[in-house]
């Protein structure tokens, strides 16, 4: 393995501010096939794979709090509505309510 290659299992904080974990070492793969956001990896280990249009958010807004109870899956569209309408807070219960409102918005405004 070249000296500048990270081994599988390496964790890095990338420019987006999130922790990414190297999950594979395929030399011809796209970058996203070798790396996965840690919160998504944890969610998928507990609940199974998520579709590509779903991301995992931190209910308390702290992107270093990987407690499974602090993680929630949302679709890209739900995430957009949450950000547009300020439905993300540092209070996990309010963020859960925001997710539900965003889901209603997505389902009724399509």
Q: Over which residues does each language-model region extend?
A:
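Short, cationic Gly/His-enriched loop motifs
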Residues: 32-105
């Amino acid at each position: 393995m070249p000296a500048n290659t990270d081994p599988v299992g390496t964790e890095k904080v990338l420019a987006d501010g999130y922790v990414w974990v190297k999950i594979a070492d395929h030399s011809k793969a796209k970058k996203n096939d070798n790396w996965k956001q840690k919160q998504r990896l944890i969610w998928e280990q507990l609940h199974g794979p998520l579709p590509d249009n779903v991301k995992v958010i931190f209910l308390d807004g702290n992107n270093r709090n990987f407690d499974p109870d602090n993680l929630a899956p949302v679709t890209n569209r739900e995430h957009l509505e949450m950000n547009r309408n300020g439905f993300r807070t540092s209070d996990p219960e309010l963020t859960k309510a925001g997710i539900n409102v965003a889901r209603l918005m997505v389902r009724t405004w399509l």
